[in-house]
Amino acid sequence: MPGREAFYEEAPGEKRTDRIFDETAVVGIQEFASRLQAGITPTFGRWINLKAGIEIPPQIAPQIDAQLDEITNYIFEILHSSNFNQEVHESFMDLAIGTGVMLVNEGTSTNPVVFNSIPLPHVYLNTGPDNRVDCIYRKRNIRLGDLKVLYPDGNFEDIEDKILNDPDVKCTVIEGTMRNYKDPNKEVYDYVVCVKDMEAVILEDTFEGQGSNPFITFRWNKASGEVYGRGPVFNAMSAIKTTNLTI
């Protein structure tokens, strides 16, 4: 994917298409992502419905369904006014390789939910005892002056002088979201943010409850014991290389 960030370092403006002579794989990934989006999360479509479960008594289920229908409408009003459709397409492109990662953050009053497709070179994934992805590390290059905007609840006492004196200097920030298994019956995640260059921890938090992890990771297919998925592009890599060389 020449339009997606690579795993190796590149110079700004460096050409990435000089050795691509056949566009089949490049176009195929775009079509793959578009078809997935059209089939699973169609743009401006209502692709889920909340319904009363089997635990709800049948006599009150219609009333519950009516209320859940209103909630479903509100959910899709938020989704359709957000950047979800754009970001999920990018994540589906990564899924063609094998693994997609999306970050869901709380937004503002005018844009309540913000979605962000995270390129794979920016994250490191690990699995827990149940072989599910429950540990996500993310690396970011951020201006010092933007730290307080991105992490408003952070503690910047140790690096306050550096932020004031050199706000345009970029630093490496590591975010860690790790499942806490002290109580296996509760879904709890420990969240830590540190500035690597200054060895300073600026934020520690805890996410509690089912679905509290802001990172959504999904894999196309995987081999036993592996963390990352294997997508259609990964499996077809030999054919892609051969086709590119024979053009």
How should these model regions be labeled?
Residues 88-92, 158-164, 174-182, 191, ...:
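Generic recognition of flexible, low-complexity loop/linker segments
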Residues 136, 172, 193-195:
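Secreted/luminal cysteine- and crosslink-motif detector
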Residues 171-173, 215:
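A broad structural signal for short, well-ordered beta-strand segments within beta-sheet-rich domains
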